[in-house]
Curated annotation (Swiss-Prot):
InterPro entries: PRC_barrel-like_sf, PRC_RimM, RimM, RimM_N, RimM_N_sf, Transl_B-barrel_sf. This is Ribosome maturation factor RimM. An accessory protein needed during the final step in the assembly of 30S ribosomal subunit, possibly for assembly of the head region. Essential for efficient processing of 16S rRNA. May be needed both before and after RbfA during the maturation of 16S rRNA. It has affinity for free ribosomal 30S subunits but not for 70S ribosomes. It holds the Pfam family RimM. The gene is rimM.
Length: 174
């Protein structure tokens, strides 16, 4: 499974740098000079192209990245919208209990401890207050805090996430 670690927002300047929106918890590890990145025009098309990073610098909450072979604004602008991806098999295993990669949680069926089906985890949102699970259900979407008091169990093998929601939480989606 491919995981997106960054997205090219636009070209920067005339020498071929690109502005990259970071989508990884490890930008210092993923975006370093000498590292190889695979860029794809979209998630569903082709194998993409590999680039070697020549330079990186911070640009607010984004990065300015110089890629080998991208030496002018036109070439850089051609990368606009490209996604930098890695293979999930390349991720190190997680040693901490009750800790998961986002892609492991996305797609899990959500049910309550009483056995009521709620929906499917569509996305994991990272906020200043903590992680939220965006759960798609028949009535729309419900945001469930990913905390031990609410998420009682996660079974990756069975593809089920069990919650004990406080009163009213599931009513917010309707």
């Amino acid at each position: 499974m491919e995981l997106v670690i960054g997205r090219v927002v636009k070209a920067h300047g005339i020498t071929g740098e690109v502005v990259v929106e970071i989508r990884t918890d490890e930008p210092d590890r993923r975006f370093t000079p000498g590292a190889s990145l695979r860029a794809k025009r979209s998630r569903d098309g082709g194998t993409g192209r590999n680039y070697v990073i020549e330079g990186v610098r911070e640009h607010g909450a984004r990065l300015l990245v110089r890629l080998a072979g991208v030496n002018d604004r036109d070439t850089a602008d051609g990368l606009r919208g490209s996604l930098f991806v890695i293979d999930s098999a390349d991720l190190p295993p997680i040693d901490e209990p009750d800790t998961y990669y986002d892609h492991q949680l996305e797609g899990l069926r959500v049910r309550t401890t009483a056995g009521q089906d709620v929906g499917v985890v569509a996305e994991v949102l990272h906020t200043g207050a903590g992680e939220l699970l965006a759960v798609k259900c028949d009535s729309g979407e419900v945001l469930v805090p990913f905390v031990g008091a609410i998420v009682t169990s996660v079974s990756l093998d069975d593809r089920i996430l069990e919650i004990d929601p406080p009163d009213g939480l599931l009513d917010l989606g309707s």
